[in-house]
Amino acid sequence: MTKSYRQGQILKLIRGKRIGTQDELAQELKSQGIAATQVTLSRDIRDLRLVKTREGYKEMAEEEQGPQFSLLAGEFLRDVLRAQNLVVLKTSPGHANSVAVALDNEEWPEVVGTIAGDDTILVIAPDTPTAEAVQEKLLGLLEHQ
């Protein structure tokens, strides 16, 4: 079974039914005889540019790819905190990964990288002043919700 076949099946699944978690996706694939680890599914979700919404995983339309971070942040971002050169984003449970991927896709030059958990994103800036600027930028998004 190839990567492209597995990813094609993932797209068919999310187009046909509500898939809300990676566990649900893994179970659906398993029922089709396709075994995939959580790491593999995370990569597939990133490669396919899927976003996790309240209605489950969805494909991101080409025209949505630019402003997607603003949209996701507006819907799921709850708090922005800073500790030296690190900015911590709190999101609704289960949405940190999709918000982090969208932020990564923005390619902000002041962001070195991100690490996401279930409801927390660690945004790494090169230094404290840059982290302060990132925090202000993100707080601006919170204020416009």
Swiss-Prot record:
Q: What is its main location?
A: cytoplasm
Which keywords are on file for this protein? Amino-acid biosynthesis, Arginine biosynthesis, Cytoplasm, DNA-binding, Repressor, Transcription, Transcription regulation
Q: Name a biological process GO annotation.
A: regulation of arginine biosynthetic process
Question: Which Pfam families has this protein been placed in?
Answer: Arg_repressor, Arg_repressor_C
The disulfide bonds in this chain are none
Any idea which GO molecular function terms this record carries? arginine binding; DNA binding; DNA-binding transcription factor activity
Q: Which residues cross the membrane?
A: none
SUPFAM superfamilies (alphabetical): C-terminal domain of arginine repressor (SSF55252), Winged helix' DNA-binding domain (SSF46785)
Domain of life, per lineage: Bacteria
Pathway listed for it is: Amino-acid biosynthesis; L-arginine biosynthesis [regulation]
Q: Which InterPro entries match?
A: Arg_repress (IPR001669), Arg_repress_C (IPR020899), Arg_repress_C_sf (IPR036251), Arg_repress_DNA-bd (IPR020900), WH-like_DNA-bd_sf (IPR036388), WH_DNA-bd_sf (IPR036390)
Q: Does the keyword Cytoplasm apply?
A: yes
Got a GO cellular component term for this one? Answer: cytoplasm
Location of the protein in the cell: Cytoplasm
Q: Which family does it belong to?
A: Belongs to the ArgR family.
Q: What does this protein do?
A: Regulates arginine biosynthesis genes.
Q: State the PANTHER family in the record.
A: ARGININE REPRESSOR (PTHR34471:SF1)
Name it: Arginine repressor
